[in-house]
Amino acid sequence: MNNIFSKLRDFVGLNEQVEYEYYEEEPETDNNYQNLYQQENPQPPAPQESATAQNRRWREPVPTMGDDIAAGSKPMGNVIGMPGAINGISEVLVLEPRTFEEMPQAIQALRERKSVVLNLTIMDPDQAQRAVDFVAGGTYALDGHQERIGESIFLFTPSCVQVSTQGGVLHEVPQPPARPSRPTGSPNQTWGNETNRMAQ
C-alpha cells in the first residue's frame, strides 16, 4: 500500500528534492554605505524654508466634502457614473440582426444599462436560436432579465429595469433589504433564554 502512494508522489512530483540556490554577497563596508546614501538622497531643505511651508499649510483652509458639494465642484475621482443615468433617461435599443456576428452589440447595450428588443424574424431559425441563447447567456451574466414578446421577438433588460404587463409585474427591480431592528432587551437576558431552551 505504501508502494502505491510513493509511486503516486513520484508521478506528481512531490518526492523531488528541492534545490535552493544561495548567492553570497560581499559585505559592504561602512564607507560604501555612507557614500551611497549621500549620493541617492539630497540634503534636506534649509530649516527656514520648511518652517514657512508649515505656516502656509496651517493658515490655508482645508476644503471639506460638504464645501465641494455646495460649491458644485467636480466629484471625487474614484466615482464612476453609470451610462444612461446621467439625465435619468432610459434607452431601448431595437435590433434586427441579419447575422450572428451582430449579437455582441446587444450585450454591449446591456452592459451600458440599455434595454434591448431583438427582432429575429429576418434571421435563419438556427442562427436565431443561437443568437437568443448567446444574448440570454450575456443577460444572465449581467443579472438581467429576458422575456419573449412575440414570435421571434425578445426583450432583454438590465437588472435596473422593471418589466410589467397589464396583468401585473413580471420582474421587479430588487430593493436593498431593510435591516431588522435590534431588540431593546439586554443581550444577557436573550442569551440566557437560549441556553435554557438548549438545556431542556
From Swiss-Prot:
Cellular component GO terms held in the UniProt record: cytoplasm
Gene3D superfamilies reported in the protein's UniProt record: SepF-like protein
Subcellular location: Cytoplasm
Domain of life: Bacteria
Cell division as UniProt keyword: yes
Stored InterPro entries: Cell_div_SepF (IPR023052), Cell_div_SepF/SepF-rel (IPR007561), SepF-like_sf (IPR038594)
A Pfam family this chain is assigned to: SepF
Residue stretches in coiled coil: none
Gene Ontology biological-process entries: division septum assembly; FtsZ-dependent cytokinesis
Protein keywords: Cell cycle, Cell division, Cytoplasm, Septation
Stretches the record annotates as Disordered: 35-60, 170-200
Ranges annotated as biased composition (Polar residues): 183-200
Biological role: Cell division protein that is part of the divisome complex and is recruited early to the Z-ring. Probably stimulates Z-ring formation, perhaps through the cross-linking of FtsZ protofilaments. Its function overlaps with FtsA.
The protein's assembly and partners: Homodimer. Interacts with FtsZ.
Family that this chain belongs to: Belongs to the SepF family.
HAMAP family to which the protein is assigned, alphabetical: SepF (MF_01197)
Designated name of the protein: Cell division protein SepF
UniProt source species: Nostoc punctiforme (strain ATCC 29133 / PCC 73102)
